[in-house]
């Protein structure tokens, strides 16, 4: 054909002509009803790679047609573009599967979901819904500009919306780096739990409180800073659990898990506040590893229970 030539684009800043490439336009094949009924495999993402994240994405999985009586296998049906896009799925946005602030491209979906949701925990300004009242109160501060958590470090004066943000910020003053690379003989320490070791990017970070007391800021020359650090570490010691004393547990972890709401295991939208409270009280050594493995088992079990519930709802 005479029209199938190389496309030439003129640059605004230069008179030179740049040869780009041959652009082939292929008509989009319309999706038929038979294609929409065929089960398809879910995308290759973190959901498929990491089993401990099954609980986060279990409500995104649907069962293909005809699999209710047979062997149930998790599939995604793409009967419509709205269902193919996970961000437009109401279930994906129902309880918030990510901690902290949402991505900029998901805010509009959250607002639209709030307009059609029956949840009573709703922001009266932007109609966004939340899984719990505490999350709503923290969210409203983004509209009012309220920052009730003030850093009392001398000459700092920074304020934060959530208490967890204040605790993370104060590590910059104290020099704390409680998160250590789990790789043996690495020794890389970090201030935040969401960092990754450059040498071992796939290794997880574990919480490890320093045993030597205050860090590099201990010998501060400023008297006010020294007093603040002393008060800070005294408060930390009072909150830290006494070694050798554990809270009595009348129930096993599995029994306690079965009686809790399965949605409690999903990450909430409350930032890092609750997560840091648990990490602060966590012991060190092998107990941390055992607790992490137990949490992974809980999330795997939650993912399996969610799939079973979806299968029951589909068959009903």
Swiss-Prot record:
One CC-aspect GO term: nucleus
Q: Where in the chain are the C2H2-type zinc fingers?
A: 121-143, 149-173
**What are the UniProt keywords, alphabetically?**
Activator, Coiled coil, DNA-binding, Metal-binding, Nucleus, Repeat, Transcription, Transcription regulation, Zinc, Zinc-finger
Which InterPro entries does this chain map to?
Znf_C2H2_sf (IPR036236), Znf_C2H2_type (IPR013087)
GO annotation terms (biological process) = regulation of transcription by RNA polymerase II
List where in the cell it is found: Nucleus
Ranges for the region named Disordered are 61-97, 234-294
Domain of life of the native organism: Eukaryota
Family annotation (PANTHER family) = TRANSCRIPTIONAL REPRESSOR PROTEIN YY, ZINC FINGER PROTEIN 367
The family this protein is said to belong to: Belongs to the krueppel C2H2-type zinc-finger protein family.
Q: Specify the protein name.
A: Zinc finger protein 367
Gene that this polypeptide is encoded by = znf367
């Amino acid at each position: 054909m005479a029209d199938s030539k190389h496309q030439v684009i003129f640059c605004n800043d230069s008179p030179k002509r740049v040869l780009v490439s041959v652009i082939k336009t292929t008509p989009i094949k319309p999706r038929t009803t038979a294609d929409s009924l065929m089960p398809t495999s879910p995308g290759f993402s973190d959901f498929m790679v990491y089993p401990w994240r099954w609980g986060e994405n279990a409500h995104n999985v649907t069962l293909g047609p005809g699999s209710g009586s047979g062997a149930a296998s998790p599939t995604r049906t793409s009967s419509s573009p709205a269902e193919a896009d996970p961000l437009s799925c109401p279930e994906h946005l129902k309880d918030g599967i990510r901690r902290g602030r949402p991505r900029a491209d998901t805010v509009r979906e959250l607002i639209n979901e709030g307009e059609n949701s029956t949840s009573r925990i709703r922001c009266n300004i932007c109609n966004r819904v939340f899984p719990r009242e505490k999350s709503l109160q923290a969210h409203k501060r983004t509209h009012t500009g309220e920052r009730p958590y003030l850093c009392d470090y001398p000459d700092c004066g920074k304020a934060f919306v959530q208490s967890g943000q204040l605790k993370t910020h104060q590590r910059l003053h104290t020099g704390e780096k409680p998160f250590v690379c789990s790789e043996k003989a690495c020794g890389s320490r970090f201030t935040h739990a969401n960092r990754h070791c450059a040498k071992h990017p796939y290794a997880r970070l574990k919480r490890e409180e320093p045993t030597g007391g205050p860090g590099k800021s201990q010998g501060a020359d400023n008297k006010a800073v020294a007093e603040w650090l002393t008060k800070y570490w005294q408060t930390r010691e009072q909150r830290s659990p006494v070694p050798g004393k554990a809270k009595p547990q009348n129930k096993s972890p599995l029994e306690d898990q079965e009686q809790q709401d399965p949605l409690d295991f999903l990450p909430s939208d409350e930032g890092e506040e609750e997560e840091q409270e648990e990490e602060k009280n966590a012991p060190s050594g092998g107990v941390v590893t055992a607790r992490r493995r137990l949490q992974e088992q809980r999330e795997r079990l939650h993912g399996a229970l969610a799939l079973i519930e979806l299968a029951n709802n589909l068959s009903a």
